[in-house]
Regions:
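A short, well-structured juxtamembrane/interface segment
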Residues: 29-47, 234-254
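N-terminal, charged amphipathic alpha-helical interaction modules
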Residues: 244, 265-266
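N-terminal amphipathic, basic helical "cap/leader" segment at the start of enzyme domains
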Residues: 248, 260, 267-269
Length: 407
């Protein structure tokens, strides 16, 4: 093997190992507390409370928006939409927004530890909100100290799995409403279409301690699942990631830019990709990048006048140039808006890349991207988490790639 390629492969392996160790340690330590937090959150939702998530930095903004999407638009057919808001810097400072919006029954979830975020948490607690934060000394009622993880990209990946597991398991307690404060007990719960998420749960469980124990085990199982899927994604596609990192570095150094897109939770991943290139958390230089999910005026205009299939296509026509790189994120690989954008990107001479799930969908079957990375799962939260690891590693590999030789 080429020595440079061997070094790159070793780096991918090391990045994977760091993630596996951090994931195992965090969830082994915190699974029981996470189960109890799910119960407390369910009590708030049962009182018609809302989740109010907020973050100030570009990366934290993407997480606030991601967690809101998951609660409002559940991927499990038949599960209720739970009210959630994602507040970010577009509305000004965060603390005044939270002070204006938060209500006593709400759940306040803070991403980041800037003074503005800490002030927002204080305002939420004053209102009577249940408060959750991912940094120490935040003043939140529920703190999960991710600061002990040195790599900021890994911290963000662990946070994503954390809030996915909260969303996945809150529904258990809502289905067992007799376990919620102020609610009459019911003899059975109905996990229905979500039963695949909770393999440890019996259908007539009524004891809180027993359900908490089951939820803890389910959270640990999900932590194992993402570790395995992350390993598959980064190991199977290590060579492809190295090649993509080199090509992306060449295009960026030549004046091109990265253009990212996705739908739903994957739209917030596109936000994060662009944040990682524009304002990298790991100390690398800023790189040119554009988020096609950002301008709601353009998206809604195209959706209204033409149709949702064209929301990215029209923007690729407007912004895409030969020399740019188009990066698509899709859990299914079948979204028509993604397929149309990739086809147009190729017509324009752009390098096309895609992170997909399942078996790769139409993106992989029809070779619609030059570089395809498949997280082989049908579990949408786990796919998104593996994608985050994939594009975070890709971002680091861009800086490890040698710049193109001078002509």
């Amino acid at each position: 093997m080429n020595p440079k390629l061997a070094h790159g492969a070793q780096r991918v392996e090391a990045l994977l190992q760091d993630r596996s160790e951090a994931n195992a340690h965090f969830f082994q330590t915190e699974a029981e507390r996470l189960a109890r937090l799910c119960h407390k959150m369910a009590e708030r939702f049962a009182r018609e409370g809302r989740l109010v998530a907020f973050g100030a930095s570009p990366s934290d903004r993407s997480d606030a928006r991601h967690v809101a999407v998951e609660f409002v638009h559940p991927v499990i057919v038949g599960k209720r939409a739970l009210p959630a808001l994602g507040l970010a810097g577009e509305g000004g400072q965060i603390a005044p927004q939270v002070a204006l919006e938060a209500e006593a029954a709400d759940i306040a979830m803070a991403f980041g530890g800037e003074p503005d975020i800490l002030a927002a948490l204080a305002a939420a607690r004053e209102r009577g909100c249940l408060t959750v934060a991912f940094t120490r000394d935040s003043g939140a009622e529920w703190e999960f100290d991710l600061g002990v993880i040195a790599d900021p990209l890994i911290r963000q990946e662990i946070a994503e799995t954390l809030y996915h597991t909260l969303w996945e398991h809150v529904h258990i307690f809502l289905d067992n409403r007799g376990l919620l404060e102020g609610r009459a007990a019911r003899p059975v719960h109905d996990s229905g279409a979500s039963s695949f998420l909770y393999p440890f749960l019996g259908q007539q469980e009524t004891d809180l301690d027993a359900i908490l124990a089951d939820v803890k085990q389910s959270i640990l199982l999900k932590a194992d699942e993402i570790s395995a899927l992350r390993t598959q994604t980064l190991s199977e596609f290590a060579g492809e990631l190295l090649d993509a990192g080199r090509v992306l570095r060449e295009r960026l150094d030549a004046g091109g830019r990265l253009i990212a897109l996705g739908n739903g939770g994957s739209a917030t991943d596109a936000m994060d990709v662009v944040a990682d290139f524009r304002t990298p958390m790991f100390g690398g230089p800023p790189r040119r990048a554009l988020d096609l999910t950002e301008d709601t005026g353009i998206i809604t205009a195209v959706a209204n006048d033409i149709g949702t299939d064209a929301i990215f296509l029209r923007q690729v026509i407007a912004y895409g140039r030969e020399g740019d790189v188009l990066l698509a994120l899709s859990t299914s690989g079948n979204s028509l808006s993604i397929l149309e954008a990739l086809r147009e990107g190729r017509r324009r001479g752009m390098v096309t890349m895609a992170f997909v799930g399942y078996d790769g969908g139409n993106v992989a079957a029809n070779s619609l991207a030059d570089h395809v990375f498949i997280s082989r799962s049908e579990n949408i939260p786990r796919i998104q988490e593996a994608h985050a690891s994939g594009y975070h590693v890709l971002r680091e590999l861009v800086e490890l790639a040698e710049p193109p030789a001078e002509p």
